[in-house]
């Protein structure tokens, strides 16, 4: 996935189906061929809060957090 639209310090949140790993668009639809299947945040704290809230309400979804270089920062899943 290309995160070149992110600026230094921004974080991308990529959501995926937990059971299949299929990446989802921000709308929740499967992102086959999508060019922007992530949400961007200005900080890791904001990205983490969004991702935690999402997986708490949708335990079948997991989130990956990435920096502007594409480095994986962390994976967030529901604890339920």
Where are these regions (language model features)?
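Short aromatic-glycine-(Arg/Gly/Cys) micro-motifs in beta-strand/loop hairpins
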Residues: 2-36, 64-68
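A short, charged, amphipathic alpha-helix used as a generic interaction element across diverse proteins
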Residues: 30-33, 38-62
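Short, mixed-charge low-complexity intrinsically disordered segments
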Residues: 56-80
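Low-complexity, intrinsically disordered short peptide segments enriched in small/polar/basic residues
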Residues: 8-11, 19-20, 52, 58, ...
């Amino acid at each position: 996935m290309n995160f070149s639209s992110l600026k230094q310090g921004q974080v991308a949140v990529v959501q995926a189906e937990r059971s299949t790993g299929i990446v989802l668009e921000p709308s929740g639809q499967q992102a086959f061929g999508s060019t922007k299947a992530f949400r961007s945040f200005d900080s890791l704290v904001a990205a983490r809060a969004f991702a935690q809230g999402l997986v708490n309400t949708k335990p079948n979804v997991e989130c990956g957090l990435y920096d502007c270089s594409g480095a994986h920062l962390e994976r967030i899943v529901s604890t339920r």
